[in-house]
Amino acid sequence: MSDVFVREGVVEDFNELMRLAIDATRENAFVEPDTMMLAEHMYAALTRQMGVAGVIGGGPGEPLEGAIVLRVGPVWYSKSPIIEEKAIYVSPEFRSAKGGRARKLAEWAKGVSDNLGIPLSIGVLSNTRTEAKIRLYERVFGAPAGVYFLYNAKTGLTEG
């Protein structure tokens, strides 16, 4: 695929989005994932129920190379909606490929925020290649608005 672009995910992408979500949790979760909860979040994003998913890959139902899942809702202290990034993931075999998939997914999320006119909350919660991920986000979003800590936990349920 020479032209890498993000399209909005649709219900036909459910199985592929679930595959990516499970891979992402294996690589980066810090507690054991609940597959049913993952499925509910993925389906809600694909059907625009409080969110949306951006995907890179073939057409609907075809293999995906990467995805971002966004949820729209209030923060704990306000009824005002925000966009909260739930996951951004690119399959390992496409991370070094030309096209800048992670950047395109981040830029797509930024576009969703611009189009809706509401804030986007997005960050890096990872113990692997953290600095590179932060640099990417700084290029797309500007200066960070804080830092995140994990105590008594480490990201990544599998080694590698």
Regions found by a protein language model. Name each.
Residues 22-43:
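Conserved GNAT-fold acetyl-CoA-binding loop/helix
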Residues 62-73:
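Conserved beta-strand in the GNAT
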Residues 134, 138-160:
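C-terminal "cap" of GNAT-fold acetyltransferases
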